[in-house]
Amino acid sequence: MSTRLNDSPTTKDFRLGQCPKGWRGIVSGLVSIEGLSIPWSEMERRLLEMGFVEGAALEILHDGPIQHDPIAVRVDDITIAVRRADANAILVRPVE
């Protein structure tokens, strides 16, 4: 099942897990992903509680030494470590 926070997706949306270190943008929505160890509803709840809500500003501050995982992301005014696989559930777009 796919869940969107945004009813009007654009072609500018892409997955946070694909972004390089230093990238800045905003959260445009959440989508379900395959292969989670927990139900999608639980993952969605966790991401929302961490601050990955529509319109939140973010920046990738750091990526890990092994396969660039996990990534450190500043979401508004907090810093969060997220696995790249989980970050693929977060749709983002560049700041215009």
Where are the regions a protein language model picked out?
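Compact, charge-rich alpha-helical regulatory domains located at protein termini
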Residues: 1-48, 53, 59-65, 69-96
